[in-house]
From Swiss-Prot:
Keyword Secreted: yes
Keyword Hydrolase on entry: yes
Protein name: Deubiquitinase SseL
Residues annotated as the enzyme's active site: 223, 285
Species, as recorded: Salmonella paratyphi B (strain ATCC BAA-1250 / SPB7)
Amino acid sequence: MNICVNSLYRLSTPQFHSLYSEDVSDEALALLIGEVENGNQNCIDLLCNLALRNDDLGHKVEKLLFDLFSGKRSGSPDIDKKINQACLVLHQIANNDITKDNTEWKKLHAPSRLLYMAGSATTDLSKKIGIAHKIMGDQFAQTDQEQVGVENLWCGARMLSSDELAAATQGLVQESPLLSVNYPIGLIHPTTKENILSTQLLEKIAQSGLSHNEVFLVNTGDHWLLCLFYKLAEKIKCLIFNTYYDLNENTKQEIIEAAKIAGISESDEVNFIEMNLQNNVPNGCGLFCYHTIQLLSNAGQNDPVTTLREFAEKFLTLSVEEQALFNTQTRRQIYEYSLQ
């Protein structure tokens, strides 16, 4: 038994037994996590079983597994595939005739990180859609362009919905007091032709005023862009970060008109950074909005224009594989906020 446990899990027999107790020893858990990070499949299977627990430890382990799966935490190169396959096996067990009504498996019958990882692994479309229904429920598009159909949940070319982007960016703001992020909006109302950015700015100023770094996520019809109002040398500036083709002049003018409400008097105080970063990140405009908010929240007093321009220029030097990995990992990290 000693030899078997040690060879499979790199744990002593007492350490292994402690994993099934009420209080798992910190030493045993640390050793197990280390093996998981190195890609030990047996330890991954064991940690996924621990993640089924409905206590603090179970939630902690489930979060750790998702961090490895989404690239937020580093592990072996194929760690995400090993984890989601382990979750898929658990999902199959959870749905057999013996265990399907067992409450110990409830994380695989309701929205959870474990269920999301299992769904990403299955190749059976009907099962994939069934899992997506459990995760997403009934969602409705707020614009004609939003793709909220459940069959698209794991698609690497899916446009982020307003709710997904809001959940993720609000989650980021809670971690950083330097930014204020508003709920995502369309730029122009489809029927009244009202400039919604202007309306949101007026409401924000009336209610609480603009913060030193105020972010608006704006959809121009089928594309998300980031609009930042910030103070530089006591002067209000506006930065538009657009990761696809250059905006047309009408759209730019609508943004400039809205910016005047924030106190910007000259059009040259609205800075447009426009670079196509999406060749290998299809429909990834929302991903870049999320990522740039991360960058801005960590930029301190640095000039936002410099921060975002340097990021865009560096991103274009990445290989196709690195850009594709950014697409996969960022989508996973964003959707995690909708699972909480």
